[in-house]
Regions:
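Conserved acidic-Pro-Pro-aromatic motif
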Residues: 37-39, 49-52, 57-64, 76, ...
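Generic detector of short, locally flexible boundary/turn motifs and exposed helical patches
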Residues: 1-7, 25-31, 131-138, 179-182
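SAM cofactor-binding core of SAM-dependent methyltransferases
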Residues: 14-123, 137
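A generic structural signal for solvent-exposed, polar alpha-helical segments
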Residues: 10-11, 31, 222
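Homeobox/homeodomain signature
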Residues: 7, 102, 107, 154-157
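Rossmann-like AdoMet
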Residues: 1-21
Length: 252
């Protein structure tokens, strides 16, 4: 069972953005049209979430940060998808990901910066810190999936929480980072409105999910009546070929 503090506290209307499986998230409906800056840490080869978001919000700016997505990795991914599609005759649409990348990120609204997100600036490693990214930004929707590096930037997220309307974040290896998570949840003023297991990561030695996807919403967007003792999260299976994970929480 997961610790009690990890479960959702408020019930709000949610909309699914992005892929049906991995790469998609449930987010508060009311936040989408109010967002001025969509900032995403971690992109990979799936930007369906970002594309969906910009469909519903015609005016917000998008900046993504991912140092692993380069021209070389995109071309390599293209040939891998081509081989897979020809051999197994499945998912032919993935062949066009390379073209889709250039069409989407070379427009006037969407920018992909090849930087690694960290706590400090390190030019040699192309690492950029959150102060440089979030400073002077308002009405922020923040999405984070950076494979355990999220724990290095939690203090900076707290620093800019007043300007964040919504945070969607993947917490990896939660069993090893419960103290950090508990500290973050106590200091972070945004409230958890949805928690989902990521079944791609599997279970730990206590049969708890290793990774959770959490959606936080700013307090200004809900009422006291929205607080509920037990909330059933909206979730979709990340990996349809792996066993579904059901979340259960301790009472205290």
């Amino acid at each position: 069972m997961l610790s009690y503090f990890l479960q959702p506290k408020v019930s709000v209307k949610l909309r699914r953005l992005g892929s049906k499986n991995d790469g998609g998230y449930f987010v508060p409906k009311k936040i989408i049209p109010l967002t001025e800056n969509l900032i995403c840490f971690g992109l990979g080869f799936n930007w369906d979430f970002e594309k969906d978001f910009l469909k519903y919000n015609k005016f917000c700016k998008l900046i993504t940060y991912d140092h692993t997505v380069t021209y070389f990795s995109l071309i390599k991914n293209f040939f891998q998808n081509l081989f897979f599609s020809i051999r197994y005759r499945k998912e032919p649409e993935k062949i066009f990901k390379l073209i889709d990348y250039f069409l989407f990120f070379y427009g006037y609204r969407a920018i992909h910066k090849k930087n690694k997100i960290g706590y400090t600036n390190i030019k040699k490693q192309k690492q950029i810190d959150l102060d440089k990214v979030l400073k002077n930004k308002k009405k922020i929707f923040l999405k984070i999936d950076i494979e355990s590096d999220e724990y290095k930037i939690l203090d900076k997220i707290i620093k800019y929480q007043k300007d964040i309307l919504c945070l969607v974040i993947e917490f990896h290896k939660i069993g090893d980072n419960l103290k950090k998570l508990k500290k973050f949840y106590k200091k972070f003023k945004l409230v958890n409105c949805n928690t989902c297991p990521n079944n791609s990561s599997g279970l730990d030695n206590k049969n708890n999910t290793k990774t959770i996807e959490v959606t936080f919403i700013n307090k200004i967007f809900f009422k006291k009546d929205d607080y509920q003792k037990k909330i059933v999260s909206k979730c979709s299976i990340n990996n349809p070929y792996k066993k579904k994970i059901i979340l259960n929480y301790n009472k205290s």
